[in-house]
Amino acid sequence: MFGKKISSANIRRIIRRVDWVAGSRYEIYRDDYSVENPSPLTQANRLYDANYYVLNSDFKVYVCIDNGSTGSNPLGNVSQDEPTFTDLEPSKAGNSGDGYLWKYLFTVSPSDIIKFDSTEFITVPNSWGSSQDSQIRSVRENGDSSVNQNQIKHVYIENAGSGYANGLSQEVDIIAVSYTHLTLPTKRIV
């Protein structure tokens, strides 16, 4: 009989590995994928089965905020620019115009790469909520920063309608409740 004691230093949470590959399509992060509303690309019934995040060649993890999808292009564009930035605002990865907008999350630590590297899984920070690692703290607390002020970064409009005037905008306060009803004289959210 054989046994080995495992400490918390040898345990990591993992997620399915989705490598960024030029010419591939990735899905937008949406929390409403279900049997009735599968993801457009992989037909996943759960968010965690959709390809909405990627691991780049430098072991940085990003979430896809936009993939250039439209009503006539529901699957989105192919991704041409590998995300490599580490600033906290969602950004384009390059100048190809592929329509992708990525949000940087974290970098897999070198020690985790050595201990846990796999072709099937990515390690994620074990203590995301309490970590004092400056990089994780910065990402975690970005939503509470005075710069970001918990902004909505992307709005998905299921049925855009027609007859709206371009260039009109209306500022509205969105309060965190179970739902929000907006009535705008310009009928447009920017």
Predicted regions mapped to residue ranges:
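Feature for peripheral, non-core segments
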Residues: M1-V61, I65-L182
